[in-house]
Design a protein with these regions (language model features):
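Short hydrophobic beta-strand element within catalytic cores of glycosyltransferases
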Residues: 286, 291, 295-298
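Carbohydrate-associated surface elements
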Residues: 146, 165
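Aromatic "clamp/platform" in nucleotide-sugar-dependent glycosyltransferases that forms part
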Residues: 278
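Conserved donor-binding/catalytic core segment of Leloir-type glycosyltransferases
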Residues: 4, 141, 185-202, 208-211, ...
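A conserved mid-protein helix/loop that constitutes part of the nucleotide-sugar donor-binding site
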Residues: 17-21, 199-213, 236
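Nucleotide-activated donor-binding/catalytic signature segment of Leloir-type glycosyltransferases, i.e.
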Residues: 227, 238-261
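N-terminal strand-loop element at the rim of the active site
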Residues: 5-13, 28-75
């Protein structure tokens, strides 16, 4: 079976992390020839990390023209479509991982789509992209039952639930990386960590407010943010974040994208991970933190209850988030339970379930 997985970026966003790990796990199964298609934005010719050579990577050049979000979405679809359509007949399965790659793939034939989470957009081009990528694929995968229920409620469409895996061993090893952790400790001190950038969906302003409250009790506590490479324009939200930080008299450490090899020790050295997204599809970052032995404070969402169970603290407001962070700092939970929970999510299991899904398509 020859499989094409398509994603919109080479950067370390959650959906891209998923796509790489799934491709490698599928390539480890007998009889599968796995190809990974992506847009190489800004001159990228490879993904943010090395990819198993058993996976064939096709990075389609996508120069930065400085265009606005709407035109950039349409150009992304056009560019990926032109490159992929000529090779499409070689594949038995075409599997898109986001709305851009789904729209590109469906121009030349049917595809299946993983709905990682549902978004609410205002840019007309994105609204249309999102809608078509939910409605028109021949079949859908969702990474959680909560998202599958949203798809059913919103569109009356069924989806197969296949949970993500997590590279738990990698983040558990981060806890043993004494040199790496020491480097982060020298740079950042004692810190609450947020992963995923400064974005509305990530609830970053709420976490900022919570951090400022917690800092009144723990004056040496720092707030560190990592990640944030995105296709979308969140400049207004970032400006609001910076203004509010200044008003609160705090100075968050914004790292941007962290090198792949340095991320596990960054996570492991954190005093706690704040994961307070207002909308999520799964939640890889908190599972990675649990694997590293780090306490997690999460927004109280059904999907996070589904994935994380009772292994994290839940909160819904800045006051409650601050209180949960302080509890985690004062009395961290036994890391063994959370670590064991994270090890229950494997990419090998996810790959086997995907293969069964592909075979059921006929």
């Amino acid at each position: 079976m020859r499989i094409a997985l398509l994603t919109y970026s080479t950067k370390p966003r959650g959906g891209v992390v998923h796509t790489l790990a799934l491709a490698e796990a599928l390539a480890g199964l007998d009889g599968l020839d796995v190809h990974l298609w992506t847009l190489g934005r800004g001159g990228d010719t490879a993904f943010f990390r090395p990819v198993d050579p058993a996976v064939t990577v096709h990075a389609v050049p996508f120069p930065d023209l400085g265009d606005e979000v709407g035109p950039r979405i349409l150009r992304s679809i056009d560019t990926l479509d032109r490159a992929f359509a000529a090779e499409r007949p070689a594949y038995d399965v075409v599997h898109a991982q986001d709305c851009i790659s789904a729209n590109a793939a469906m121009r030349s034939g049917p595809c299946v789509r993983t709905v990682h989470h549902l978004d609410t957009f205002t840019t007309p081009e994105l609204v249309a992209c999102h809608e078509r990528a939910v409605v028109e694929p021949v079949a859908r995968v969702c990474v959680s039952a909560a998202v599958a229920a949203e798809v059913e409620a919103g569109w009356g469409l069924p989806a197969t639930v296949i949970a993500n895996g997590v590279d738990a061993a990698r983040f558990e090893a981060g806890g043993r990386d004494t040199e790496g952790r020491a480097r982060w400790r020298r740079r950042c001190g004692r810190y609450v960590l947020a992963l995923g950038g400064i974005e509305p969906r990530k609830g970053t302003l709420d976490l900022l407010e919570a951090y400022a409250l917690a800092r009144r009790e723990v004056p040496d506590l720092r707030f560190v943010l990592a990640g944030g490479e995105t296709l979308f324009d969140y400049r207004d939200y970032r400006a609001a974040f910076d203004r509010r930080a200044a008003e609160l008299g705090v100075e968050p450490e914004v790292l941007g994208v962290v090198a792949h090899d340095a991320l596990p020790s960054l996570v492991a050295e954190a005093a706690a991970l704040g994961f307070v997204s207002t909308q999520e599809g799964f939640g890889l970052a908190p599972l990675e933190a649990l694997a590293a032995g780090v306490p997690v404070v999460a927004r109280d969402l059904p999907v996070l209850r589904e994935v994380l169970g009772d292994h994290v603290a839940y909160a819904a407001t800045p006051d409650a988030i601050a209180a949960a962070l302080l509890d985690a700092l004062a009395a961290p939970p036994d890391p063994a339970r959370g670590r064991a929970h994270s090890h229950g999510f494997t990419w090998r299991r996810a790959a086997a379930e995907h293969l069964a899904f592909y075979r059921a398509l006929g």
